[in-house]
Amino acid sequence: MGFKDKILFWKDEVQYRTLAVADQVANRFLHSFENVYQGDESVEDADSRPVGLTNETLSHSSDFFVLPEERISTRVKIRRQNILNTTLILGMLIALVIWTAILSTNSYFSSSLASASPLFNKEGRVVRPMRESNLGLHADPQTRKSSKTLYDLLSDFDNAFYDDENMILGSLAFGENTYSRQPYVANGYIGSRIPNIGFGYALDTLNLYADAPGALNNGWPLRNRRFAGSFVSDFYSLQAKLNSTNFPELDEKGYTTVISSIPEWTDLQFTVDLNGTKWFNPQSVLIDDVINYNQNLSMKDGIVSTNMDWLNGMINIKSEVWAHRKIHSLGITRLEISLNLDALPDEFTELPVTVYDIIDLNTSHRTTLYEKGQDEDNKAIYMIVNPDNVPYSNAVVYSTCTIKGTENNFSPYNFTSDDRIARNYMTNLTEENPKVVIYKYTSVVSSEYNNDEPNPNVNLKFASNIANTAKGNYKSLLSNHKRAWYDLYNDAFIEIPSDSLLEMTARSSLFHLLANTRQYNVSTTRGLPVGVGGLSSDSYGGMVFWDADVWMAPALLPFFPNIAMNMNNYRNATHQQAIENAKQYNYPGAVYPWTSGRYANCTSTGPCIDYEYHINVDIALASFSIYMNGAEGADEDYLRFTTWPMVKDAAVFFKAYVKYNETLGEYETYNLTDPDEFANHVNNGAFTNAGIKTLLKWATDIGTHLGEEVDPKWMEIADNIHIPRSDSNITLEYSGMNSSVEIKQADVTLMVYPLGYINDESILNNAIKDLYYYSERQSASGPAMTYPVFVAAAASLLNHGSSSQSYLYKSVLPYLRSPFAQFSEQSDDNFLTNGLTQPAFPFLTANGGFLQSILFGLTGLRYSYEVTPRTKKISRLLKFDPVKLPLLPGGIAIRNFKYMGQVLDIIIDDNNGTIAHKGGDKPIRIKVPNRDILHDRNITSALYSKRDDDLSATDDYYGTYFTLYPNEELVIPLYDTKLNIDGNIAESKQITNLTAGVPGDVGFSALDGNNYTHWQPFDKSDNAKLLIDLGFNSTHVIKKGIILWGQRPAKNISLSVLPHSERIEQLFANITDLLETSSITKGGLPLNQMLGQTQSNVTAEIDDDILALLNWKGDDLDQLIPYLPDMHLLQEKFIPILKDYPIKPNQRYYEEIIDDDIIKLLPSNTTEFTIDYNSIPGGEKRARYVVLTVHGTYDDDDDLKGATIREIVLQE
């Protein structure tokens, strides 16, 4: 068969492989001649295809040396225009043999792929023309419907709701003001947290978890009372002392900069004259006076809407608040006050209403009044404030109002105090004129926004122009605002069709990050500082931590690279101060402080020395990753003038900082703190030392690429820096770590991700053991950025199970707060039980981490580069290593992923991973790693000897290269992860806990094929139940099983099954259809009619487990329950097939582990059981639904928590 013929792999594998080999040879020769005559141009700079290749030529050069056959797309067709005869094929095969011999004997050519010349890269394309029909995802609606029960596991979801279709989050309960129940509006420049009534300023008056002194306070370092207030970006004050700080002695060396809040820009209030004057503001409205309440946040457009009836339902109040997405300094409030005519008393005649437009200094924090006044010409008010101790910075708040249908009749109003300014409007509501609508247009302009303009009068004029131009144009402004949000989402979208909660979390995370950042109107001399709490909170003083560099910016980079660049430009703008910091401590180079604000000086909250040195690696990583992404502007000039100075000066500093230990023959670090802040001032922090090693390699590669001077000492240190390890080859978090350690947050695991995603040194020799070991030692109340790291690490390291997805659920369920899908920093918000930690809120770090767990974790995408040995030039590429996602049937889709200035769709369905090149005019290079080199089994300590090298960028780590051209798609079969235990029919199936688990635990961990994750009952005195669904049309006869307990086995277990019935399958199929297509409350068909049932109207008691199953599969089955008792199907019961089976531990207590501080993985207690069906009544043995009941713990100790269920194994 000749090249002209279309050859399908599945029809003739031998011919396919022969032609693929010949095709590679031909293309390698073509590339060889091109490189000889045209020079070494990387694909990213090439404007045309290689000579001899056309759009009709599908050049397949999969790496036949190392790529597993199952990774080759069975749908790829090879088309050739040229008719080549058999002689040419044989000639090429002979040439291939000779060529291979040359490569294998020449050490220059056989170097690792991470540094191989493009001339000899296994480069080519396994692609096809892009097919839009293949870019959609499909998922079982029953699975998605079942996923909605996960919302019930979120904190405070009782009176919350989510409108999936319209992306609206909401609350139906009016209560006291508390931070976690409040939405906010923001546009990347201004923001305001919205109190219960929908506008205005409010101090918190309720803590949901504790009533104790300090319960209403925010956390370190301000420890002030939480409040719903307004903020403007980069408006930092200077504070000589703070309420709480780690290193107060450093206050003598320089003040700390923390964010100032500004006078509340949504502040409207009104009074009604009804048996006396009654005020409508957040301080005065009583809970008992409000009915029919709802407050909504639309993630589609960032508008907060509030609606309620007040004073016995007599008055309806509606409000809308939004920060204009394009006109960054403009905030708008719409207030509608109307009579409910049906609720008016018989004697009603009129209701006097007075509306106040107010700007109040008392609603700001850490500010000084500069000026306030009335602008009579424009019937407006304004106030100018300075942040504390910064007289050369100011912010103007300028407000003007209009009344719908009338002239602006607001008049000046004089308060008795000098720190407020107001105008008011009086009207009477009657049955003939029952409504008044007020529009408040507020402009906020700060010096930092207006080109660092220090003159307040200039900023006042700017603010006046914005507000008065906007006045009277509400509809057009609203349309423009919504369009701006629509355009943002048109650039970025994530789909998870099988799981409503995860998809909502992805979309809300994207919303929260976008709401607190902006693409333009950012000072090039300042950049964009983004605090942990964004623009609606002063958590952590609004200061900038590594959270911005490692967690937030990388999540935005694939969608909005210009925002990531703006954030990194803040570090560039403060780089000179980092140089001064190093000089202050007699070091060369530059060193950044742990916290930054208006300045980047060393402070009591943010030391530069003897603390978290990894911040310097984090900042360099963020900048280098922008270059790796290759967006517009992230070019060679960006690398030379932005990234290189940061990387170089960090390398110079670290060269001076490390100390050589002659006994070890390695370089060490001293008196530092790693990301795990439970362990302060330790030596040889693993993440810090690995970061130094990696950064020094970056410095060498970048400097050589740019032709800059490179210090050879950098690589000497990189090759010989000490990474502490135990005798069992587990990476120690720091030298001297003991076996009783509790880890605050992800630390050692960060060495895999994100530290490894820039280059090919992403697989640590002992990373798998590290992942297992440290997953058991995370603090139950640790911060919310921990488990997204485990998602990425598990996806890239483990070839068994589905724990990357169970970790994904652990990233959400303990931390996400209803009703407005905001992350808390902690899994436990009760400061009396979590170690006196008041959580940051909202915690944008978690939003960034969660997005990264999807963008880079589940997809296996990594930015990477290679260095050509001959030219020493860097060539950028994208690594793609997707695996099957059994817990997410239907897969995930990432729309409009930006890379090298091109636009991609990333699709992971049930069988294939697809990268579709749908925008741009340049090809991109993609590398698919070979997962067969991973070994995540047989990792007992005896198998590995202690090694000196820590990062395995060995010559054995190969992959396959593809070139993807515009309007083409790369399709590769997903890596099919293996079963953890052979024959386990329950692994990676759907599961739900019917009883409470320990906060932070998820039921998926018991079926994820990872023996080092677990689910644990909250109370060991109760019968804990887990309900397992073995899958649609998947029934089994369970004959035996195994339970892995870890170190805390149960006292006994029971196992029950629901005998299989085709009618039961039909029941759930029709319930799903009914819930998706009709509504019982709207007169839809009764369920028994849908099923064709004609049972007598006899009510029977429903088995509790049946009811739990129905609620799991139906979500809102409470609507259907009145119809269900008539059906005999619901009289079915779960049948016990194993009852009160006693548990006996089979592993001893390893006392020496504690006594001798031995760091190693311990074997798990296991229980094996068999099922004797001879003693079980009933004929049907097959089942789809299984309930595992776990009671007590084997040890009678004081710990109230139940047994740890690491893995459930069911076998036929």
From Swiss-Prot:
Ranges annotated as spanning the membrane: 83-103
Keyword terms, alphabetized: Glycoprotein, Glycosidase, Hydrolase, Membrane, Periplasm, Secreted, Signal-anchor, Transmembrane, Transmembrane helix
Sugar-bearing residue positions: 243, 275, 296, 362, 414, 428, 521, 572, 601, 661, 671, 729, 738, 912, 938, 993, 1011, 1033, 1052, 1070, 1097, 1165
Membrane topology, from the record: Single-pass type II membrane protein
Annotated InterPro entries: 6-hairpin_glycosidase_sf, 6hp_glycosidase-like_sf, Gal_mutarotase_sf_dom, Glyco_hydro_65_C, Glyco_hydro_65_M, Glyco_hydro_65_N, Glyco_hydro_65_N_sf
Record family assignment: Belongs to the glycosyl hydrolase 65 family.
Protein role: Periplasmic/secreted acid trehalase that catalyzes hydrolysis of the disaccharide trehalose and required for growth on trehalose as carbon source. Growth on trehalose is not restricted to respiration.
Name the UniProt record assigns to this protein: Periplasmic/secreted acid trehalase ATH1
Species, as recorded: Candida glabrata (Yeast)
